Regions:
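Short S/T/G/P-rich N-terminal loop/turn motif that feeds into the first structured element of a domain
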Residues: 1-51, 57-206
Length: 206
């Protein structure tokens, strides 16, 4: 399975309008496209940074959708008064303990490593980290997306509320440091977002 993420760093005052557009106009259109298995959107209301991600059953389906989603992406960026940055990923890990409620938040970690080590990273996450992540306060789900050519990876851990995410912060940091140390991954950024939309039909990979 594959995903395309579109990041826009825009006007915080435009977020509600952009979320409504993605929910009411873009999402119904995208979900009817061949091979689409969902859409999510996360936002930082302070900075105006917003990341919309579409998930696809295959790499071919993702690429075939590009022309159709182009105008949607441009409209979304125009509403946010920003420039879209597009990245394509393979969905390496997806595990849900339960669905995200209204008010859910997520902590996103971007990392860089050797492309040859990505399989070890996803295996380690599955076999030695998931059960410990499930014990974190308010844990809902985790996903790991990878770019096998560049060695880039991003994990998004969803919590039921911002309060729960805060209570889990120290434990999550310790797990992150253990995971990256074992695999020689460099963490390039950690950020927190409100989960504005979560309409994913992506099957579990665990």
């Amino acid at each position: 399975m594959y995903a395309r993420s579109t990041t826009v760093r825009g006007d915080p005052q435009a977020l509600d309008e952009a979320i409504a557009y993605m929910r009411d106009d873009a999402m119904p259109t995208i979900q009817e496209m061949e091979g689409c298995i969902g859409l999510s959107m996360m936002c930082d209301r302070d900075s105006g940074r917003c990341i919309a991600t579409t998930a696809w059953r295959s790499e071919e389906a993702m690429h075939d959708s590009e022309r159709a989603v182009h105008n949607i992406r441009e409209r979304y960026a125009e509403m946010m008064r920003g420039t879209p940055e597009v990245q394509e990923w393979e969905i390496a890990v997806l595990h849900r303990l339960h669905t995200a409620p209204d008010g859910a938040c997520c902590r996103v970690i971007w990392g860089q490593g050797d492309p040859a080590d990505l399989d070890d990273a996803t295996s380690t996450l599955r076999t030695s980290m998931l059960s410990r992540l499930e014990e974190l306060p308010g844990f809902c789900s985790i996903s790991m997306l990878v770019d096998r050519q560049s060695g880039r990876a991003v994990t998004a851990t969803v919590y039921e509320s911002r309060d729960a995410m805060g209570r889990a912060a120290e434990q999550a940091k310790a797990l992150r440091e253990e995971f990256t140390r074992q695999l020689g991954l460099e963490v390039t950024e950690v950020a927190e977002f409100d989960l504005a939309l979560a309409h994913l039909r992506v099957p579990e990979t665990v």
